[in-house]
Amino acid sequence: MLSRVLTVFMLSLGFLLPTSEAQQVTRIPRVGFVAPQGRSLPLFDAFRQGLANLGYVDGQNILIEPRFAEGHYERFPGIFAQLVGLKVDVLAVTGAVTARAAKKAVSDIPLVFSVVVDPVRDNVVANLRQPDGNLTGVTCFDPRQATKQLKLLREIIPSLRRVAVLGDQGVSEALMNASEEQARALDLQPQRLRVAGPNPDLQAAFAAMRQQHADALLVLEEPVLGVHAKEVSELAAKDRLPTLFAPS
């Protein structure tokens, strides 16, 4: 799924930037990249490599200006103000929370979003076929993903019955609903848990898992959980709870 998202993402950006052959001006186009996580985010390296594969090499014929909120969503207004001040030519943003903040802060710079499960229900765009104003992007929603993840958990734990599903309260419930539906289809008992950012109460979430005797944990590919993946991993290890993270 990630490769498919990146392919469309890079192609979208490619249409917005001049090709190296057509670029005769001395000014090098600037591309802003904004994510809610930290610099260790694998998607940024894939983003930069994807642009290079299309002929847009950072430091040669484009300049990439990466910014990472590191889980502090209150930083978004300042981040976008800074990038507007740098006169970036296009903004690439990941996640619904980031896309909403970009939409609010920027009106005259092309915005390309990715890793948004449901752009309409997440209040990123009003219409998928005709996105608002300066917005375009791709959805990462694939209902089959939950089935594959749950089947993998069952292979690891043949006795699997109760699976906790941890999601982000700040985005739509599309991925959570699909995961619950697929769990029931596999005769599993899902436990819905949603935490709110930027400082989620993960201790309470894990206490609820212990109370319900969860056999395993499925962590959804949603913003606040990507930011706090290390803390989730540590709590799961402490409880000796088998955990599967979606790629991020």
Per-range role (PLM):
Residues 1-248:
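Short hydrophobic alpha-helices and adjacent helix-cap/hinge residues
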